From Swiss-Prot:
One of its GO terms (molecular function) is dynactin binding. It comes from the Eukaryota. Self-associates. Component of the FTS/Hook/FHIP complex (FHF complex), composed of AKTIP/FTS, FHIP1B, and one or more members of the Hook family of proteins HOOK1, HOOK2, and HOOK3. May interact directly with AKTIP/FTS, HOOK1 and HOOK2. Associates with several subunits of the homotypic vesicular sorting complex (the HOPS complex) including VPS16 and VPS41; these interactions may be indirect. Interacts with MSR1, and this association is stimulated by ligand binding to MSR1. Interacts with microtubules. (Microbial infection) Interacts with Salmonella typhimurium spiC. It comes from Bos taurus. This is Protein Hook homolog 3. Belongs to the hook family. GO terms for cellular component: FHF complex; Golgi apparatus; microtubule. The gene is HOOK3. Keywords: Cytoplasm, Cytoskeleton, Golgi apparatus, Microtubule, Protein transport, Transport. Its main location: cytoplasm. GO terms for biological process: early endosome to late endosome transport; endosome organization; endosome to lysosome transport; lysosome organization; protein localization to perinuclear region of cytoplasm; protein transport. It is found in: Cytoplasm, Cytoskeleton; Golgi apparatus. Acts as an adapter protein linking the dynein motor complex to various cargos and converts dynein from a non-processive to a highly processive motor in the presence of dynactin. Facilitates the interaction between dynein and dynactin and activates dynein processivity (the ability to move along a microtubule for a long distance without falling off the track). Predominantly recruits 2 dyneins, which increases both the force and speed of the microtubule motor. Component of the FTS/Hook/FHIP complex (FHF complex). (Microbial infection) Serves as a target for the spiC protein from Salmonella typhimurium, which inactivates it, leading to a strong alteration in cellular trafficking.
C-alpha cells in the first residue's frame, strides 16, 4: 500500500 507507506514515512 503506497498510502500507508507514505503516512509511515511522514511520521518518521
Amino acid at each position: 500500500v503506497e498510502l500507508q507507506n507514505r503516512l509511515s514515512d511522514e511520521s518518521q
